[in-house]
Amino acid sequence: MKKLFAFIACALVCGAMSAQLKVSIMGDSYSTFTGSMPKYYDTFYPNQFCGVTEQSQQWWAQVIEKNGWQLEKNDSWSGSTVCCRGYNHDDYSDRAFVTRLNCIGNPDILFIFGGTNDDWTHEPFGDYKYSDWTKEDLYFYRPAFAYLLDNLKKLYPKMKIYSLLNDGMSENLGESMREICKHYDVPVIAVEGIEKRMNHPTAAGMTKIAEQIQAFLDSEKK
């Protein structure tokens, strides 16, 4: 009888583990943490000045812990843009989100936290375009973001995608992200009132981001 109970308990635990949702992150510096991403990616965290010194303080780590999920891949590269154009009009094809769409593993959920650097480069946003992209199109945020979501939807048809909108961004970025996400039925979670140093979230800022994401996730369950 004891062996039977042990077998049932093991089966329940294994079943729970197999049902655990896998989460991937596609982001820029806000989502980096050394040791959680590919070694050759540029990173910003841990950062003593911002007070974020442990991976558990990262916004995504808090959300994953809160929901009992597991991290699949953190594909975040500090300073990266969604499109292939970066600061000083440099070519960012090697680190652009559109280049990294095959690097997220096989998650059930994907959080995309990008657009901040695209906004800060002050490059043109381009036109809304939802098909027949050219290589040149991918150097502009609007067509590049549409290309990203379109391909993610096709490559991972069962995956749930959330797009995070940083606070303090231009109206142009906010409108562009919302319009493109609406086209692909991707929820936008706009975070607000985030404490920052050097334009990056502090430990308190990370917690604020996590809390606002959690509030959005909880609202979906109602």
Regions from the language model: what does each represent?
Residues F33-G35:
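Short N-terminal binding/cap micro-motifs at the start of the first secondary-structure element
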Residues M26-G27, L164:
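Short hydrophobic segments within beta-strands
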Residues M1-Q20:
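Bacterial Sec-dependent N-terminal signal peptides
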Residues Y30-S31, G205:
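Short active-site segment of divalent metal-dependent hydrolases/proteases
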Residues Y30, S78-T81, G168, E195:
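Residue-level detector of flexible, active-site-proximal loop/helix-junction positions
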